[in-house]
A protein has these predicted regions:
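Signature of N-terminal electron-transfer/Fe-S-associated modules in redox systems
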Residues: 1-160
Length: 160
């Protein structure tokens, strides 16, 4: 595995985020910094958390606490396309298990697994706040609601 380090582009983006906050409140940009890094690498390593801490002039443990509190931050490499299936009560009652079963049938992997080619990771997640459109899933930053096997097939076919 190659060593992860903040790229010049990531540092520039984080510095832009820092401009939104008072100079003595750099830690306010921690979530944005984690998002920027995850957008680049698809996950956030402990080494990168240390680099973020150094850049934001805050203890590394505070970056780690934020990164591990929120489920949106990955702590190991995930596939090029991360598919998050809501399995909270509304989605569960409306068929999230059928969604997961169909995804496994189509991709060959279940929750917490990544396809051998590194293309797709499937995750079970708690409520994504789209209960009215249950069952639903998130692919990247896009929400897909009122899922059927047919709509799931179209979504999978549309992934590059």
């Amino acid at each position: 595995m190659t060593e992860m380090t903040l790229s010049a582009n990531a540092i520039t983006e984080i510095e832009k985020e820092l401009e939104k906050y008072p100079a003595d409140r750099k830690e306010s940009a921690v979530m944005a910094a984690l998002r920027i890094v995850q957008d680049e690498f698809r996950w956030v390593s402990k080494e990168i958390m240390q680099e973020i801490a150094d850049l934001l002039e805050m203890p590394a443990i505070h970056v780690y606490e934020v990164a591990t509190f929120y489920s949106m931050y990955e702590h190991k490499d995930v596939g090029q396309h991360k598919i998050c299936v809501c399995t909270n009560i509304s989605c569960q009652l409306c068929g999230s298990k059928k969604v997961l079963d169909h995804l496994k049938e189509k991709t060959g992997v279940g929750p917490g697994e990544t396809t051998p080619d590194g293309r797709i990771t499937i995750k079970e997640v708690e409520c994504l706040g789209a209960c009215g459109g249950a069952p639903m899933m998130q692919v990247g930053r896009e929400y897909y609601e009122n899922l059927t096997t047919e709509s799931i097939d179209r979504i999978l076919e549309g992934l590059d």
